[in-house]
Amino acid sequence: MKILDCTLRDGGFVNDFDWDLRFAKRYLEFMSRIKVPIVELGYWKQNSKSKNRFYNFNEDTLDQIYNGVSTPLDMSIMIDYHYCSKKISDYPKNGTTPINLVRITSRKEDLPKALKFAETLKNKTNLDMAFQIINSTNYTRKELLKTTEIIAKHDFLYVYFADSHGNLNLNENYDNYRDSVEALRFNGKKVGFHLHNHTGRALMNYYFCKNNNI
């Protein structure tokens, strides 16, 4: 199992993405010391929902937070296709920053365009790409499999199922995901779950993933 911590990025919804830079720097240092493999700090250069720096995250903010970290670690950014910049030049190229992973998500109706954009972004930046299926508990088993079979044809290192509403119970509902997980793995994708704790199930679901090698 490989942990990606996105507390500052996803937690930004509770404070309008306005983390104090000193706090963010201390947080990143702590993640470094406990050897979290990947840390995601914000949405990259988006401004439709907030003008604050962890929604409109950029190179300058990254430098302020990352410089001085005692142990280098891999960095990830998130983009929502519906809101993100479509200018490829707005994104860093591999090796120019600590960022080496872009995670993209999209609405159902935007999926074909999002996949095409992710493919272009991968080719132009040489960054690893990941796709996150949001609201995954809203899908039927067949809908989820159909979606993942489409995603599996593209060059994503990781594919995540997001428990956007925190109502996922993998002990009871994993059968809804089983075929999709197998299809992704068959196509060489690494599979993950993005867990939320709205209903107090995140730890339970974490142990399910850990015990089932997800």
Listing of model-derived features with the role each one plays in the protein:
Residues Y158-I214:
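Catalytic alpha/beta core domains of metabolic enzymes, predominantly
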Residues D18-L21, I133-E143, N167-L168, H194-L203:
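Active-site glycine- and acidic-residue-rich loops that bind
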Residues S32, I38, Y43-I150:
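Active-site beta->alpha loop and helix N-cap motifs at the rims of alpha/beta catalytic domains
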Residues G11, M31, V102, V159, ...:
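Conserved, mostly hydrophobic/aromatic
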Residues D20-L21, Y55-D60, E143-E149, N173-D179, ...:
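Charged helix-capping and loop-helix junction motifs
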Residues Q64, G68, T120-K124, I150-H154, ...:
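Alpha-helical structural signal in soluble globular domains
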Residues F23-P37:
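Alpha-helical scaffold segments that flank or form the walls of functional sites
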